[in-house]
Structures are given as C-alpha cells and as structure tokens.
Amino acid sequence: MDYFSIIKITMITEIYFQYVIYILCFGVLLLLKSESDRLLWLHLVSILVGLIANYEMKFNVLFAMFHSAVHNLWPFLKNTGYDNTEKSVYDVICHTIMVVICYHQICYTENAVTNNYYTFHLFSVMIIIGALFNCVVSGKAIGSNDRFLHSLFEYTTIFQALSTGYWVATMLWYHHLDNIHFYSHWIIWIGLMTINWFVYKFYPNLVGISMRYKYVEAVFIVCTWYSGIISSPLIKYINVY
C-alpha cells in the first residue's frame, strides 16, 4: 500500500470517527440526571477543549457556548413549543452570525466545494438572506400581539434550522472542508436539520423534551469538540515527536 493510500484511509477513518464521537456525546446527556448536570458537562468539556484549541477553534467553541447562554437567558422554546412572550431575536441573530462564519470559512478554504460550486453558493446566500429576514421579523415581533407576525416568525425559522445544519456540517469537518465529499456531508446535515424543524413544528411537545436534555444546545456545542482538539498546537507537537 502506497503512502497516499494510507493518508486517504487515515483521513476517511478520522472523518467518520467524528460522527461516532458526536453521537456518543449525546448519549452522555441521557445518562446525566438533571438539566444543570447536562449544562455543566457541556460547558466544562467546552472550556477544556477551548483551552487547548487554536485561536480559530477557540472562537467557535466560545460562540457555541454563547448560543447556549442565549437559550438560557431568553428561553423562548418551552415545553409546549414556541413562547412568543420571550425574546427570540438574540438567538436568531446568533444563528445568522454562525452561518456567516461558516460560509466565510468555506469560501476562504482552497479547493472547498469544487463540485456543485454554484448550487452551494446560491443556496448559502439564500440561507443567509432568509436568516436575516427571520431576524427582522423576530425584532418586529417583540411586544407585538400580531398573530400573523408571530406565525411568520415561526415559519421563517426554517432558515435557522438550515443554519444549524450548516454549522454542524462545517464544525464536524472543519479541517476537511476541501474534501471532495464535503458537499454531500453538508447536504445531509442540511436535510437532517430541516426534518428536525418539521418534527418540532408538528410535535411541539418534543421541544420541551429536547430542551430538558439540552439537545438544542448540544447540537451546536459538541460538533466543535473534536475539531477543537485536533486543532491544538499541542496535538501537532505530539504528532511531530
């Protein structure tokens, strides 16, 4: 087996190993007894990862933690679904910034998404515009009793679901954005989070369960861990020696 074949197999193993780690970390949330324990675990691991990660991944880890903090400070997602008495604007702004960060990173990665180039960029711009529109609607809905406005907000949150898939796909493969299969990986996560949005829409009680187990926060946080760890200068130093 030649050198390049070994490199390819190693890369594929690493990429799909991240999926296993991602799923196992969600399993830990099921084992922990209380919401505070789950929140503590998510943030404690994030702090440890952030301490060793490079500067780019430090920012991404911290931003995922910030998103978690926003959900706890302005909990507009309740056991019964969307609560229009709480401010959602801070969360959707956070989502929009996330998708812009990811799009920027992909655009400045050499040879990223060379296949389906125009489809990817067109869809990315549509997601960003839709997410910005959702932010505007959310801001207008603050203190408003207009049912149409609140309904419009709810339906346009699908763009934030798309931004969630965008974030997870980018963070999981942060060091492999130039991989030929990244576009397929990206489409899968966009699709999964779209399905997730429809499930929440038609079964609002599941929102309460997912919030209780910190699923909504973990989706954004856990995907940064592995990429954060392997970005560490310490890991690169160990590999050299």
UniProtKB/Swiss-Prot annotation:
Listed GO CC annotations: membrane
The species this protein was found in: Acanthamoeba polyphaga mimivirus (APMV)
Q: Which UniProt keywords apply?
A: Membrane, Transmembrane, Transmembrane helix
Question: Where mainly found?
Answer: membrane
Q: Does the keyword Signal apply?
A: no
* Localization terms from the record: Membrane
Which ranges does the record mark as transmembrane?
Answer: 12-32, 39-59, 89-109, 117-137, 152-172, 180-200, 215-235
Superkingdom of source? Viruses
Q: What is the similarity comment for this entry?
A: Belongs to the mimivirus L68/R809 family.
State what protein this is by name. Answer: Uncharacterized protein L68
